[in-house]
A protein has these predicted regions:
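Non-heme Fe(II)/2-oxoglutarate
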Residues: 48, 84, 171, 184, ...
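A short secondary-structure junction signal
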Residues: 113-118, 127-130, 152-161, 167-171, ...
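A structural signal for short, well-ordered beta-strand segments
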Residues: 103, 142-144, 227-231
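Double-stranded beta-helix
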Residues: 136-139, 149-212, 236
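Non-heme Fe(II)-dependent double-stranded beta-helix
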Residues: 2-20, 27-128
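Short, structured patches in soluble enzyme cores that scaffold and shape functional sites
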Residues: 120-122, 144-148, 160
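Secondary-structure boundary elements
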Residues: 87-96, 135-136, 146-152
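Short, P/G- and charge-enriched loop/turn segments at secondary-structure junctions
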Residues: 126-132, 192-193
Protein backbone atom coordinates (compact mmCIF):
# COMPACT_ATOMS: atom_id res chain seq x y z
CA UNK A 1 0.00 0.00 0.00
CA UNK A 2 1.49 3.32 -1.08
CA UNK A 3 1.12 6.71 0.55
CA UNK A 4 1.42 9.19 -2.28
CA UNK A 5 3.72 11.87 -0.98
CA UNK A 6 5.54 13.05 -4.09
CA UNK A 7 4.18 11.57 -7.30
CA UNK A 8 4.42 14.87 -9.18
CA UNK A 9 6.90 17.58 -9.70
CA UNK A 10 5.68 20.93 -8.42
CA UNK A 11 4.85 22.39 -11.83
CA UNK A 12 2.55 19.97 -13.63
CA UNK A 13 0.34 16.94 -13.34
CA UNK A 14 1.93 13.57 -14.00
CA UNK A 15 -0.17 12.67 -17.03
CA UNK A 16 1.38 9.25 -17.46
CA UNK A 17 0.59 8.34 -13.87
CA UNK A 18 -2.98 9.51 -14.42
CA UNK A 19 -3.25 7.30 -17.50
CA UNK A 20 -1.73 4.30 -15.72
CA UNK A 21 -3.32 4.58 -12.27
CA UNK A 22 -6.49 6.57 -12.92
CA UNK A 23 -5.50 9.45 -10.65
CA UNK A 24 -2.67 11.87 -9.96
CA UNK A 25 -1.77 14.17 -7.11
CA UNK A 26 -1.28 17.93 -7.38
CA UNK A 27 0.88 19.30 -4.61
CA UNK A 28 0.18 22.86 -3.54
CA UNK A 29 -2.44 24.13 -5.97
CA UNK A 30 -2.61 26.98 -3.45
CA UNK A 31 -0.25 27.87 -0.58
CA UNK A 32 -0.77 25.95 2.64
CA UNK A 33 -2.00 29.05 4.45
CA UNK A 34 -4.93 29.28 2.01
CA UNK A 35 -5.91 25.73 2.94
CA UNK A 36 -5.57 26.61 6.62
CA UNK A 37 -7.83 29.65 6.14
CA UNK A 38 -10.45 27.52 4.40
CA UNK A 39 -10.38 25.02 7.26
CA UNK A 40 -10.85 27.81 9.81
CA UNK A 41 -13.99 28.95 7.98
CA UNK A 42 -15.29 25.38 7.88
CA UNK A 43 -14.89 25.01 11.64
CA UNK A 44 -17.09 28.09 12.02
CA UNK A 45 -19.71 26.73 9.62
CA UNK A 46 -20.09 23.40 11.40
CA UNK A 47 -20.24 25.08 14.80
CA UNK A 48 -17.47 22.99 16.35
CA UNK A 49 -14.00 23.75 17.67
CA UNK A 50 -10.60 22.17 17.01
CA UNK A 51 -9.84 22.76 20.70
CA UNK A 52 -12.92 20.95 22.08
CA UNK A 53 -12.85 17.27 21.03
CA UNK A 54 -15.74 16.56 23.40
CA UNK A 55 -18.00 18.10 20.76
CA UNK A 56 -16.88 15.66 18.08
CA UNK A 57 -19.74 13.20 18.44
CA UNK A 58 -20.52 12.31 14.81
CA UNK A 59 -18.22 10.42 12.43
CA UNK A 60 -19.07 12.69 9.49
CA UNK A 61 -20.40 16.24 9.42
CA UNK A 62 -21.27 17.71 6.03
CA UNK A 63 -20.76 21.33 5.11
CA UNK A 64 -20.28 23.19 1.83
CA UNK A 65 -18.91 26.15 -0.05
CA UNK A 66 -21.58 27.37 -2.45
CA UNK A 67 -20.22 30.80 -3.34
CA UNK A 68 -16.45 30.51 -3.78
CA UNK A 69 -15.76 33.14 -1.16
CA UNK A 70 -12.27 33.90 0.12
CA UNK A 71 -9.89 30.93 0.22
CA UNK A 72 -12.35 28.64 -1.55
CA UNK A 73 -12.33 30.89 -4.59
CA UNK A 74 -8.53 30.83 -4.53
CA UNK A 75 -8.59 27.04 -4.74
CA UNK A 76 -10.96 27.10 -7.70
CA UNK A 77 -9.00 29.84 -9.50
CA UNK A 78 -5.64 28.07 -9.09
CA UNK A 79 -3.58 28.27 -12.30
CA UNK A 80 -1.93 24.98 -11.38
CA UNK A 81 -5.32 23.28 -11.07
CA UNK A 82 -6.47 24.72 -14.40
CA UNK A 83 -3.28 23.58 -16.12
CA UNK A 84 -3.74 20.07 -14.74
CA UNK A 85 -7.35 19.86 -15.93
CA UNK A 86 -6.29 21.15 -19.35
CA UNK A 87 -3.63 18.45 -19.47
CA UNK A 88 -6.08 15.66 -18.62
CA UNK A 89 -9.31 16.76 -20.34
CA UNK A 90 -7.85 19.01 -23.01
CA UNK A 91 -7.94 22.83 -23.20
CA UNK A 92 -11.60 23.81 -23.32
CA UNK A 93 -12.59 20.28 -22.35
CA UNK A 94 -13.95 21.13 -18.90
CA UNK A 95 -16.13 23.75 -17.22
CA UNK A 96 -14.59 25.99 -14.60
CA UNK A 97 -16.13 25.77 -11.13
CA UNK A 98 -16.64 28.87 -9.02
CA UNK A 99 -17.27 27.08 -5.72
CA UNK A 100 -15.94 23.99 -3.98
CA UNK A 101 -19.34 22.44 -3.21
CA UNK A 102 -19.88 19.66 -0.66
CA UNK A 103 -17.28 18.99 2.03
CA UNK A 104 -17.48 15.99 4.37
CA UNK A 105 -15.55 16.46 7.61
CA UNK A 106 -14.49 13.10 9.13
CA UNK A 107 -13.90 12.89 12.85
CA UNK A 108 -11.78 10.48 14.90
CA UNK A 109 -12.63 8.77 18.20
CA UNK A 110 -16.21 7.89 17.25
CA UNK A 111 -17.70 4.78 15.58
CA UNK A 112 -17.32 5.10 11.79
CA UNK A 113 -20.14 5.94 9.41
CA UNK A 114 -21.57 3.23 7.17
CA UNK A 115 -20.45 4.97 3.99
CA UNK A 116 -17.18 3.26 3.21
CA UNK A 117 -18.09 1.02 0.29
CA UNK A 118 -16.14 0.88 -2.97
CA UNK A 119 -17.74 2.95 -5.72
CA UNK A 120 -17.37 5.40 -8.55
CA UNK A 121 -19.23 8.69 -8.39
CA UNK A 122 -22.26 9.45 -10.53
CA UNK A 123 -20.98 10.88 -13.79
CA UNK A 124 -23.90 11.09 -16.24
CA UNK A 125 -27.02 13.27 -16.14
CA UNK A 126 -30.26 11.65 -17.29
CA UNK A 127 -32.94 13.50 -19.23
CA UNK A 128 -34.93 14.04 -16.01
CA UNK A 129 -32.00 15.74 -14.29
CA UNK A 130 -31.04 12.81 -12.05
CA UNK A 131 -27.55 11.34 -12.13
CA UNK A 132 -26.13 7.87 -12.66
CA UNK A 133 -23.12 5.96 -13.97
CA UNK A 134 -22.53 5.23 -17.66
CA UNK A 135 -19.83 4.49 -20.23
CA UNK A 136 -20.06 8.11 -21.42
CA UNK A 137 -19.17 10.10 -18.32
CA UNK A 138 -19.62 13.84 -18.32
CA UNK A 139 -17.49 14.50 -15.25
CA UNK A 140 -14.18 13.74 -13.61
CA UNK A 141 -13.55 13.76 -9.86
CA UNK A 142 -11.50 16.29 -7.92
CA UNK A 143 -10.44 15.81 -4.29
CA UNK A 144 -9.19 18.91 -2.45
CA UNK A 145 -7.48 18.80 0.95
CA UNK A 146 -8.03 21.47 3.62
CA UNK A 147 -6.22 19.63 6.43
CA UNK A 148 -3.18 17.45 6.95
CA UNK A 149 -4.14 13.93 5.86
CA UNK A 150 -1.82 11.11 6.86
CA UNK A 151 -2.33 7.39 6.52
CA UNK A 152 -4.43 7.24 9.73
CA UNK A 153 -6.54 10.32 8.96
CA UNK A 154 -9.23 8.68 6.79
CA UNK A 155 -7.54 9.29 3.42
CA UNK A 156 -9.64 8.20 0.47
CA UNK A 157 -8.68 4.68 -0.64
CA UNK A 158 -8.02 4.27 -4.36
CA UNK A 159 -7.68 1.07 -6.38
CA UNK A 160 -4.89 2.18 -8.68
CA UNK A 161 -5.61 1.11 -12.25
CA UNK A 162 -9.20 0.07 -11.57
CA UNK A 163 -10.50 2.50 -14.20
CA UNK A 164 -9.38 0.00 -16.83
CA UNK A 165 -11.43 -2.73 -15.15
CA UNK A 166 -14.50 -0.59 -14.52
CA UNK A 167 -14.99 0.40 -18.13
CA UNK A 168 -15.20 -3.28 -19.10
CA UNK A 169 -18.13 -4.08 -16.79
CA UNK A 170 -20.37 -1.14 -17.67
CA UNK A 171 -22.98 -1.81 -20.34
CA UNK A 172 -23.13 0.45 -23.36
CA UNK A 173 -26.19 2.69 -23.49
CA UNK A 174 -27.25 2.26 -19.86
CA UNK A 175 -27.22 4.83 -17.07
CA UNK A 176 -27.10 2.86 -13.83
CA UNK A 177 -27.87 3.77 -10.24
CA UNK A 178 -24.57 3.62 -8.30
CA UNK A 179 -26.47 2.93 -5.07
CA UNK A 180 -27.51 -0.43 -6.53
CA UNK A 181 -24.06 -1.33 -7.86
CA UNK A 182 -22.28 -2.17 -4.61
CA UNK A 183 -21.58 -5.84 -5.45
CA UNK A 184 -20.27 -4.83 -8.88
CA UNK A 185 -17.96 -2.19 -7.43
CA UNK A 186 -16.64 -4.65 -4.84
CA UNK A 187 -15.52 -7.00 -7.61
CA UNK A 188 -13.79 -4.38 -9.75
CA UNK A 189 -10.04 -4.28 -9.25
CA UNK A 190 -9.75 -6.02 -5.84
CA UNK A 191 -6.22 -7.13 -6.72
CA UNK A 192 -5.13 -3.69 -7.86
CA UNK A 193 -2.58 -1.79 -5.72
CA UNK A 194 -4.17 0.24 -2.93
CA UNK A 195 -3.21 3.91 -2.79
CA UNK A 196 -4.17 6.55 -0.23
CA UNK A 197 -5.03 10.18 -0.97
CA UNK A 198 -2.72 11.68 1.65
CA UNK A 199 -1.35 15.19 1.63
CA UNK A 200 -1.36 18.67 3.11
CA UNK A 201 -3.72 21.66 3.02
CA UNK A 202 -3.62 23.02 -0.51
CA UNK A 203 -3.07 19.66 -2.23
CA UNK A 204 -5.54 18.04 -4.64
CA UNK A 205 -6.13 14.83 -6.57
CA UNK A 206 -7.51 14.52 -10.10
CA UNK A 207 -9.35 11.20 -10.42
CA UNK A 208 -10.63 9.43 -13.56
CA UNK A 209 -14.44 9.00 -13.57
CA UNK A 210 -14.04 5.19 -13.70
CA UNK A 211 -11.50 4.85 -10.87
CA UNK A 212 -12.91 2.83 -7.96
CA UNK A 213 -12.39 4.46 -4.57
CA UNK A 214 -13.79 4.46 -1.03
CA UNK A 215 -13.86 6.32 2.25
CA UNK A 216 -12.47 4.71 5.38
CA UNK A 217 -12.55 4.91 9.16
CA UNK A 218 -10.63 7.74 10.83
CA UNK A 219 -7.91 6.21 13.02
CA UNK A 220 -6.00 9.40 13.74
CA UNK A 221 -6.48 12.27 16.17
CA UNK A 222 -7.36 15.36 14.08
CA UNK A 223 -10.48 15.79 11.90
CA UNK A 224 -10.04 15.47 8.16
CA UNK A 225 -11.37 18.25 5.93
CA UNK A 226 -11.58 17.34 2.23
CA UNK A 227 -13.86 18.37 -0.61
CA UNK A 228 -14.96 15.90 -3.26
CA UNK A 229 -16.42 17.50 -6.33
CA UNK A 230 -17.32 16.71 -9.93
CA UNK A 231 -15.69 18.76 -12.65
CA UNK A 232 -18.06 18.92 -15.61
CA UNK A 233 -16.65 18.05 -19.02
CA UNK A 234 -17.76 20.11 -22.01
CA UNK A 235 -18.85 16.90 -23.74
CA UNK A 236 -19.17 13.27 -22.64
CA UNK A 237 -16.06 11.12 -22.82
CA UNK A 238 -16.14 9.22 -26.10
CA UNK A 239 -13.93 6.61 -27.81
CA UNK A 240 -11.42 8.34 -30.04
CA UNK A 241 -11.11 11.47 -27.92
CA UNK A 242 -7.54 12.74 -28.11
CA UNK A 243 -7.14 13.23 -24.36
CA UNK A 244 -5.48 11.37 -21.49
CA UNK A 245 -9.00 10.76 -20.12
CA UNK A 246 -9.71 8.55 -23.13
CA UNK A 247 -6.21 7.13 -23.43
CA UNK A 248 -6.38 5.99 -19.81
CA UNK A 249 -9.02 3.42 -20.79
CA UNK A 250 -7.46 2.57 -24.18
CA UNK A 251 -10.05 4.51 -26.18
Amino acid sequence: MDSLGSVLNMDSIDVEQFVRDGFAKLEGIVPREVGDAARALLWQRIGLSPDEPSGWTQPVVWTADLTGEGPFGQFMASPKLHAALDAVAGPGGWHRRGAVGNIPVRFPRVPPADDRGWHIDSNTMRADGTWGVSTRPGTLLLLVLFSEVGTDDAPTRIRAGSHRDMVKVLEEGQVLDPMQMGPIFDEVGPDRPLALATGSPGDAYVVHPFTVHAAQEHLGTEPRFMAQMPVLLTKPLTPGDATPLARAIDW
